[in-house]
């Protein structure tokens, strides 16, 4: 999900927290 970072940066961060 690299393109998601540009479309939804905030969402990407939340996904990262869930991944951790």
Curated annotation (Swiss-Prot):
Belongs to the peptidase A1 family. Its main location: secreted. Keywords: Aspartyl protease, Glycoprotein, Hydrolase, Protease, Secreted. It is found in: Secreted, Extracellular space. Chorionic epithelium (trophectoderm) and placental cotyledons. This is Pregnancy-associated glycoprotein 60H. The keyword Hydrolase applies. The keyword Membrane does not apply. It is an enzyme of class 3 (hydrolase). On the 2D-gel the determined pI of this protein is: 6.9, its MW is: 60 kDa.
